[in-house]
Regions:
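Rossmann-fold dinucleotide-binding core
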Residues: 122-127, 146-178
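NAD(P)+-binding Rossmann beta1-loop-alpha1 motif at the extreme N-terminus of oxidoreductases
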Residues: 29-97, 101-108, 136, 165, ...
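Glycine-rich, highly charged phosphate/nucleotide-binding loops
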Residues: 94-100, 119-126
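Short glycine-/small-residue-rich Rossmann-like dinucleotide-binding loops
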Residues: 116-118, 144
Length: 178
């Protein structure tokens, strides 16, 4: 079953699990229809829903973390939420179409993981998300950035009160998932 409603191009999707009368698990995608209902209740946010990002989100959700997700292309986000509906993620994944709504969904201090290509893509995400972050928030680059770029980013963001961690994620598709 899929329930879809719209509001100001700021859809928010959550995956929920319901037990059916026959012991089956049904997954439903629920879209919240009021912008004012955006609450800061996600433990961590992840930007970048390629294979590694998707599997890391599912891993965190399986372990009880409430995870907000954002991707540059919303079509990939919707596709991931359809996948999530078939996974035992326990309703712990929420997807956002805008960076602003994504950041607002995170509990403080906010923890944001980026799993995007090193270089220009990483830099673009940092520049886009930086005005939305506050002192004490944490930004983690899980890509394979050049070490000298990581040092420069850490220094720049520290000056703004943002904790920056450059820590490339490895282990492949299955390593991220399990």
């Amino acid at each position: 079953m899929i329930l879809i409603a719209g509001f100001l191009r700021v859809p928010i999707w959550s995956s929920c699990k319901l037990s059916g009368s026959e012991g089956r698990i049904e997954s439903i995608l629920v879209q919240v229809s009021k912008l004012s209902s955006i609450q800061s209740n996600c433990d961590v946010g992840l930007i970048g829903l390629a294979v590694m990002g998707q599997n890391l989100v599912l891993n965190m959700a399986d372990h009880g973390f409430r995870v907000a997700v954002f991707n540059r292309t919303y079509a990939r986000t919707k596709s991931f939420m359809e996948r999530c509906a078939t996974e035992p993620c326990g309703g712990n994944v929420s997807a956002f179409e805008t960076l602003d709504s994504f950041i607002k969904s995170l509990t403080r201090p906010r923890k944001v993981v980026m799993l995007v290509q090193a270089g220009d893509a990483t830099e673009a995400i940092i520049r886009a998300v930086l005005p939305l972050l506050d002192e004490g928030d944490v930004l983690i680059d899980g890509g394979n950035a050049l070490w000298s770029d990581t040092i420069c980013r850490e220094k720049e963001l520290a000056g703004k009160g943002i904790h920056f961690i450059g820590s490339g994620v490895s282990g492949g598709e299955l390593g991220a998932r399990f």
